[in-house]
């Protein structure tokens, strides 16, 4: 699909979504406040609608005038606080509300034969319920956005391993991903996150890439902040998507500058490579594969890198997971598979029995732990944001993986 068609499709979707929501909210207001002036209500809603749509109109106008597919936003606080944030907050409120309202409408259609004699009463009740739901989400969505901006969850995962080497018993691996230093994830937010990482007292720290979002501006900040992490056996990272995008037209330079900045703080960013070391008498191998939109290792080079024998514990660190890579790691007897990229479903909507996120269209491995026989795969929720400048129902995460011998753990 061409860029122009994507723009037109996005505009059409926004129009239809807002049209449905506006119709619902006008009916709901009249149900709750029957004496409300209809013209004033509609006028206020039109003004609010026009205001929140300044952002997409700006993007369309900027694209039309520049003919570029990538539009750089003004780097001013007021533009983000008064234009960008209101648009995305309102869009999330609208979509979250519509998901529930569509379900209610569907139930009304299905149950219509049973209540058609009381149609007017049911319709009035439905409109009042609509008002209550929208009012709730107007409060909940911004509140949750604020919470997910400031909060960091520490998740501890006990990994019970068959025949674990005694010297690896209790090894604490702190795993993070998608830090994405930028104008939104600034020094203060990074400080809070690194403080949480250090509070886990890690033996080993592994990162699934994406230390910045874009532009070289934040390379040194990202390296400096990660350099504050205390780790007994060091800090290691694979290459992520955004690590390629400091210079959009020169991805190799982007990765090189990020790698060099990290090296100043004794942090290794490994691009399709491996690192071996001993913990006591235990031999540990870590393999780092660049599995991103820009670069994917496949075929014989991938097999050569993954193939290894004679190690007591093997870890694979990648940015993006994927079924073929998972099966490869499993076939080469890796114990632990670590990935990020998804932000845990950065925007996740509330819905009965399931969580709905756009990330579901890309991968089934959105967050949490997955077992493939004896291999454990962990998908970390990360810290940063992409496209939408905040998180919704996806609290940033530091994952702590503690190794235990399965027999000893079972005996307890």
Please place each PLM-identified region on the residue numbering.
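Short extracytoplasmic/periplasmic juxtamembrane "stem" segments immediately C-terminal to an N-terminal membrane anchor
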Residues: 81, 85, 156-170
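Short, functionally important structural connectors and interaction interfaces within domains
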Residues: 75-78, 144-146, 151, 160, ...
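Soluble catalytic domains of enzymes that build or remodel membrane lipids, polysaccharides, and related
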Residues: 164-412
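Short amphipathic alpha-helical coupling elements at transmembrane boundaries
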Residues: 112, 159, 192-195
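Hydrophobic alpha-helical transmembrane segments in integral membrane proteins
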Residues: 137-163, 183-188
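Non-catalytic terminal accessory segments
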Residues: 1-150, 410
């Amino acid at each position: 699909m061409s860029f122009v068609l994507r723009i037109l499709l996005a505009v059409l979707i926004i129009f239809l979504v807002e049209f449905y929501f506006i119709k619902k909210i006008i009916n709901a207001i009249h149900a709750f406040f029957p004496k409300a002036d209809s013209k004033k209500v509609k006028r206020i809603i039109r003004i609010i609608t026009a205001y929140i749509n300044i952002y997409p109109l700006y993007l369309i106008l900027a694209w039309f005038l520049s003919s570029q597919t990538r539009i750089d936003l003004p780097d001013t606080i007021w533009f983000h606080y008064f234009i960008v944030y209101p648009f995305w907050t309102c869009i999330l409120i609208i979509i979250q509300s519509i998901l529930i309202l569509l379900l209610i409408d569907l139930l009304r259609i299905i149950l219509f034969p049973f209540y058609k004699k009381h149609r007017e009463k049911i319709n009035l009740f439905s409109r009042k319920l609509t008002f209550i739901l929208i009012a709730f989400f107007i409060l909940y969505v911004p509140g949750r956005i604020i919470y997910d901006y400031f909060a960091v969850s520490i998740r501890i995962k006990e990994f019970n391993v068959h025949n674990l080497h005694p010297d690896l018993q209790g090894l604490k691996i702190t795993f993070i991903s998608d830090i994405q230093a930028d104008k939104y994830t600034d020094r203060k937010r990074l400080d809070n996150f690194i403080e949480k990482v250090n509070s886990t007292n890690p033996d080993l720290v592994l990162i699934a890439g994406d230390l910045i979002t874009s532009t070289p501006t934040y390379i040194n900040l990202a390296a400096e902040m990660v350099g504050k992490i205390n780790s007994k056996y060091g800090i290691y990272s694979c290459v992520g998507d955004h690590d390629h995008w400091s210079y959009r037209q020169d991805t190799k330079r982007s990765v090189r500058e990020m790698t060099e900045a990290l090296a100043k703080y004794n942090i290794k960013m490994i691009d399709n490579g491996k690192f071996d070391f001993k913990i006591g008498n235990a031999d540990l191998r870590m393999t780092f594969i660049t599995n991103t939109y820009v670069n994917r290792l496949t075929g014989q080079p991938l097999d050569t890198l993954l193939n290894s024998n004679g190690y007591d514990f093997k870890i694979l660190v990648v940015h993006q997971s994927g079924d073929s890579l998972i099966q490869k790691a499993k076939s080469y007897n890796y114990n632990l598979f670590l990935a990020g990229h998804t932000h845990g479903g950065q925007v996740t909507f509330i819905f009965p029995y399931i969580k709905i996120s756009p990330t579901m269209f890309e991968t089934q491995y959105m967050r949490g732990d997955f077992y493939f026989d004896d291999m454990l795969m962990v998908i970390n929720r990360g810290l940063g944001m992409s496209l939408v400048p905040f998180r919704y129902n996806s609290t940033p995460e530091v994952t702590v993986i503690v190794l235990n011998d399965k027999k000893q753990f079972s005996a307890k």
